[in-house]
């Protein structure tokens, strides 16, 4: 054990070990060491820092053990956990195992008192101590059924006390460890799988846990634990000698560990405590400490790109080495009975395996391997020996594989194979072969965006998009997306869809419009790979316009014929519409886990159907037949109402009060629902409030029928916000005789519809109380969430040109926050602006909302009114 007092750098004043321990002196020592350690972080090697810290605490604990007169007691103190590995970070737990021998009652009481004083002193120093007091027998008995205790025993390290007791323990650890290699391996593998599931089995979390996320420090430790148990060694270096890993793999794993150690050390310093979650709060400060600069978002994105690249390497090494251990060391591989599928490859135990070690000397075999996987559906993965060869070959490449004509032919073969974008594409992504093939893909590996919208790096998002496209034709995912499945089944150029998916975000992070830059990349790729001009045009168009359908469906009024007409003009052909619809669905579903819902699905499908109807007309300039849709809705609603027992005359009398816009914007089921309740309602019982799911969108529909009194929206928005309901869509329609029919589509904060009867009644009652002015509109002032506080979005108001003379449309972009819509409604009310419709879209931390408004005279806003409204919104919404 090194003597920290003699360290040439740390000159802290150590308390005299011959005196009684003084809390004040030790606190001063700890403060001095913490300051020295933080200062050293800037220039010191991280390996030196974490080991130096462990050595420092070795001496501190050993000295206190002596000062509390425990040296001559039948007890010894051991470091376990990370401390047992001789590594400590500023906020790490200091895990201790105190071994005691069997003693008589009097001696045991005396020892217990001393140990209590010792541990209490450590706590009084505010150290994060984790400790247990056990006999040798207890240690092994408890470890039999607890893999965590068993792992701690493997990593135990002697600090001080009765050496004979420790030697007895260590001998039993070597000879009578209760877990066999096979059982220990399986238990640690199960433990890792469960841990990964807590993080959705992906390394690409916005706020990753440096220690426990997939690809984190725990994955490196798992590799070491399994090998150390099997080979009965404490040294990582010995694992190369035992043939568990190559020297290069050992160096790579150590480099990755040091990088993760450095970011964890910085995180602990930034947080001022143990914190392994790289939260948004800490990311800018950690980036500064690691030397990425103080450029805020840009510095964070660069740091996180490096982080994601490291954890990708760790994940690959972890899986390869654990598979190798299972196959080669536990003896489960059976290459003798492999099925030869080519001169270079075979299938053994459902894994692709190389038939000779120089298989990848021909670098085209890198791509050919994945073609083999597509051609042989029995293959479920790649053998660890072959992964090792692949990794070595990948490292030897001097240029992208796409520069080789034979590789290009093989890649085309793969993309056009019915199973090519399934398992093969997934494995190419996981083993960084896509980055070896396309130089543009290399640039997006680990590329993240510092926001709450994009849950994955660009490469991971793109992989998930392509996987979604593939699943539209995969029998295992049948009936999940019927329209997409139908359209993909009819496509004779499905490979164009996959290529568009690969290139849709390929230019992110370069600056400029990524859609335009990606379009050029896609076109060049198609020309380089020998695709026809027709194919190149389709792929390039899809990449250029991959956001168009999503923006139109979510941020425009798709019940406005002008909007549908403009979108149809952009798309121009039914074929483009089919491809774009499938690409859009796959894209949204691959962005984050909570983005896709029935509401978005319905918006996209409605836009698809309306546009498809237009594009299938024979006219060169197709138009939407509004009158036909109105008549169809009326006829269907009439049939529903007649079957419910209403008279045709009373139905027509009611409908005579409604405008044509009402029948165009609502389904027959909605019209029937509204009409039934209005016809049954005594006039003195206004307002009529209906809450249900008649829209079948997986959302809740709120319908209010009331006397027209202006700015009803502001009151309703305040109530809905106080009830923790998000407005997705609002339609404000007036009857011909002074009534309003307001329809709101809402979801609860957790994204679920409102279904509980008591909640529905609560919302309805509060609305009645507010509309009857029995209570004021609830306040919408609530603090921002922890996550939202780390983001800023400049408020922008953009007026959108429209041919409608009686209305004005504007888009609002601002930071999403509690009560935003209610606040905007209040601003409109103050400015005497009447809301006609609203479309609410939340993009992570950013609100991108569309509002259609008019004046009290039912005219469009003048330029002066627009200027005043814009200034008021920006002033009131800015922080």
UniProtKB/Swiss-Prot annotation:
<dbReference type="Pfam" id="PF08335">
    <property type="entry name" value="GlnD_UR_UTase"/>
</dbReference>
<dbReference type="InterPro" id="IPR002934">
    <property type="entry name" value="Polymerase_NTP_transf_dom"/>
</dbReference>
<keyword id="KW-0460">Magnesium</keyword>
<dbReference type="InterPro" id="IPR002912">
    <property type="entry name" value="ACT_dom"/>
</dbReference>
<dbReference type="Pfam" id="PF01966">
    <property type="entry name" value="HD"/>
</dbReference>
<keyword id="KW-0378">Hydrolase</keyword>
<feature type="domain" description="HD">
    <location>
        <begin position="458"/>
        <end position="580"/>
    </location>
</feature>
<feature type="domain" description="ACT 2">
    <location>
        <begin position="809"/>
        <end position="879"/>
    </location>
</feature>
<comment type="similarity">
    <text>Belongs to the GlnD family.</text>
</comment>
<keyword id="KW-0808">Transferase</keyword>
<dbReference type="InterPro" id="IPR045865">
    <property type="entry name" value="ACT-like_dom_sf"/>
</dbReference>
<dbReference type="GO" id="GO:0008081">
    <property type="term" value="F:phosphoric diester hydrolase activity"/>
</dbReference>
<dbReference type="GO" id="GO:0006808">
    <property type="term" value="P:regulation of nitrogen utilization"/>
</dbReference>
<keyword id="KW-0511">Multifunctional enzyme</keyword>
<dbReference type="Pfam" id="PF01909">
    <property type="entry name" value="NTP_transf_2"/>
</dbReference>
<comment type="function">
    <text>Modifies, by uridylylation and deuridylylation, the PII regulatory proteins (GlnB and homologs), in response to the nitrogen status of the cell that GlnD senses through the glutamine level. Under low glutamine levels, catalyzes the conversion of the PII proteins and UTP to PII-UMP and PPi, while under higher glutamine levels, GlnD hydrolyzes PII-UMP to PII and UMP (deuridylylation). Thus, controls uridylylation state and activity of the PII proteins, and plays an important role in the regulation of nitrogen assimilation and metabolism.</text>
</comment>
<keyword id="KW-0548">Nucleotidyltransferase</keyword>
<feature type="domain" description="ACT 1">
    <location>
        <begin position="701"/>
        <end position="782"/>
    </location>
</feature>
<dbReference type="InterPro" id="IPR003607">
    <property type="entry name" value="HD/PDEase_dom"/>
</dbReference>
<feature type="region of interest" description="Uridylyl-removing">
    <location>
        <begin position="341"/>
        <end position="700"/>
    </location>
</feature>
<protein>
    <recommendedName>
        <fullName>Bifunctional uridylyltransferase/uridylyl-removing enzyme</fullName>
        <ecNumber>2.7.7.59</ecNumber>
        <ecNumber>3.1.4.-</ecNumber>
    </recommendedName>
</protein>
<dbReference type="InterPro" id="IPR013546">
    <property type="entry name" value="PII_UdlTrfase/GS_AdlTrfase"/>
</dbReference>
<dbReference type="InterPro" id="IPR006674">
    <property type="entry name" value="HD_domain"/>
</dbReference>
<dbReference type="InterPro" id="IPR010043">
    <property type="entry name" value="UTase/UR"/>
</dbReference>
<keyword id="KW-0677">Repeat</keyword>
<dbReference type="InterPro" id="IPR043519">
    <property type="entry name" value="NT_sf"/>
</dbReference>
<feature type="region of interest" description="Uridylyltransferase">
    <location>
        <begin position="1"/>
        <end position="340"/>
    </location>
</feature>
<dbReference type="GO" id="GO:0008773">
    <property type="term" value="F:[protein-PII] uridylyltransferase activity"/>
</dbReference>
């Amino acid at each position: 054990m090194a003597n920290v007092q003699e360290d040439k750098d740390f000159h802290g004043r150590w308390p005299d070990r011959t005196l009684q321990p003084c809390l004040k002196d030790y606190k001063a020592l700890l403060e001095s060491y913490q300051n020295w350690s933080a200062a050293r972080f800037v220039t010191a090697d991280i390996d030196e820092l974490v080991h130096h810290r462990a050595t420092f605490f070795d001496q501190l604990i050993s000295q206190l053990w002596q000062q509390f007169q425990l040296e001559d007691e039948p007890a010894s103190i051991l470091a376990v956990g990370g401390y047992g590995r001789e590594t400590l970070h500023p906020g790490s737990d200091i895990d201790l195992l105190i071994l005691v021998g069997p003693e008589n009652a009097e001696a045991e009481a005396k020892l217990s008192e001393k140990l209590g004083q010792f541990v209490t002193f450590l706590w009084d120093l505010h150290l994060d101590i984790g400790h247990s007091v056990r006999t040798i027998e207890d240690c092994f008995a408890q470890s039999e059924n607890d893999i965590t205790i068993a792992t701690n025993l493997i990593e135990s390290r002697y600090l001080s006390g009765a050496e004979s007791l420790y030697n007895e323990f260590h001998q039993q650890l070597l000879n009578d460890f209760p877990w066999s290699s096979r059982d220990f391996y399986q238990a640690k593998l199960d433990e890792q799988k469960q841990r990964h599931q807590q993080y959705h089995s992906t390394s690409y979390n916005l706020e990753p846990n440096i220690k426990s996320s997939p690809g984190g420090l725990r994955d490196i430790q798992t590799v070491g634990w399994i090998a150390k148990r099997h080979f009965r060694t404490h040294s990582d270096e010995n694992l190369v000698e035992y043939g568990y890993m190559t020297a290069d793999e050992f160096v790579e794993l150590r480099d990755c560990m040091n990088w993760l150690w450095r970011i964890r050390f910085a995180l602990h310093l930034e947080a001022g405590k143990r914190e392994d979650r790289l939260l948004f709060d800490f990311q800018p400060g950690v980036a500064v400490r690691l030397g990425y600069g103080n450029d805020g978002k840009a510095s964070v994105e660069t740091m996180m790109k490096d982080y994601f690249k490291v954890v990708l390497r760790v994940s690959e090494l972890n899986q390869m080495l654990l598979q190798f251990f299972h196959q080669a060391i536990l003896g489960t591989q059976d290459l003798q009975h492999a099925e030869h599928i080519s001169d270079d490859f075979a299938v053994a135990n459902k894994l692709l395996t190389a038939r000779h070690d120089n298989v990848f000397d021909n670098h085209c075999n890198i791509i050919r391997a994945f073609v083999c996987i597509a051609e042989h559906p029995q293959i479920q993965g790649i053998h660890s020996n072959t992964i090792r060869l692949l990794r070595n070959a990948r490292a030897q490449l001097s240029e992208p594989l796409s520069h080789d004509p034979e590789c290009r032919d093989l890649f085309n073969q793969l993309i056009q194979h019915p199973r090519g974008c399934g398992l093969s594409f997934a494995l190419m992504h996981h083993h960084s072969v896509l980055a070896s093939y396309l130089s543009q893909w290399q640039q997006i590996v680990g590329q993240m965006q510092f926001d709450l919208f994009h849950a994955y790096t660009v490469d991971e998002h793109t992989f998930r998009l392509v996987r979604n496209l593939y699943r539209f034709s995969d029998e295992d995912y049948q009936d999940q997306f019927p329209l997409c499945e139908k359209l993909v089944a009819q496509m004779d150029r499905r490979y164009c869809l996959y290529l568009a998916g690969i290139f849709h975000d390929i230019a992110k992070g370069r600056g400029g419009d990524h859609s335009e830059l990606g379009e050029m990349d896609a076109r060049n790729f198609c020309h380089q790979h020998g695709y026809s001009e027709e194919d190149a045009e389709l792929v390039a168009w899809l990449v250029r316009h991959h956001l168009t359908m999503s923006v139109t469906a979510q941020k425009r009024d798709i019940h406005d014929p002008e909007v549908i007409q403009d979108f149809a003009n952009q798309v121009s052909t039914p074929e483009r519409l089919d491809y774009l619809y499938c690409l859009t669905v796959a894209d949204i579903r691959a962005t984050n886990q909570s983005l896709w819902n029935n509401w978005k699905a319905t918006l996209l499908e409605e836009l698809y159907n309306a546009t498809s109807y237009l594009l299938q007309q024979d006219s060169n300039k197709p138009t939407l037949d509004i009158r036909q849709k109105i008549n169809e809705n009326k006829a269907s609603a009439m049939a529903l109402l007649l079957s419910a027992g209403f008279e045709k005359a009373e139905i027509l009398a009611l409908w005579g009060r409604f405008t044509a816009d009402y029948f165009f914007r609502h389904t027959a089921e909605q019209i029937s629902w509204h009409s039934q309740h209005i016809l049954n309602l005594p006039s003195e019982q206004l307002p009529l409030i209906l809450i249900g799911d008649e829209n079948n969108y997986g959302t809740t529909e709120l319908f209010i029928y009331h006397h027209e009194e202006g700015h009803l929206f502001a009151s309703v928005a305040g109530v809905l916000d106080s009830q923790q309901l998000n407005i997705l869509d609002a339609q404000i329609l007036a009857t011909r005789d002074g009534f309003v029919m307001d329809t709101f589509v809402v979801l609860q904060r957790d994204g679920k519809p409102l279904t509980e009867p008591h909640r529905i009644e609560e919302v309805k009652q509060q609305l009645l109380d507010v509309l009857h002015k029995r209570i004021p509109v609830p306040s919408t002032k609530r603090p921002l969430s922890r996550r939202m506080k780390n983001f800023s979005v400049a408020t922008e108001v953009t007026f959108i040109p429209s041919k409608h003379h009686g209305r004005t449309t504007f888009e609002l972009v601002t930071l999403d926050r509690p009560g935003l819509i209610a606040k905007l409604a209040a601003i409109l009310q103050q400015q005497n602006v009447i809301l006609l419709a609203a479309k609410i879209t939340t993009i992570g931390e950013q609100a991108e909302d569309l509002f259609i408004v008019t004046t009290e005279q039912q005219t469009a806003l003048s330029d002066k009114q627009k200027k005043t409204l814009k200034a008021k919104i920006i002033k009131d919404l800015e922080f």
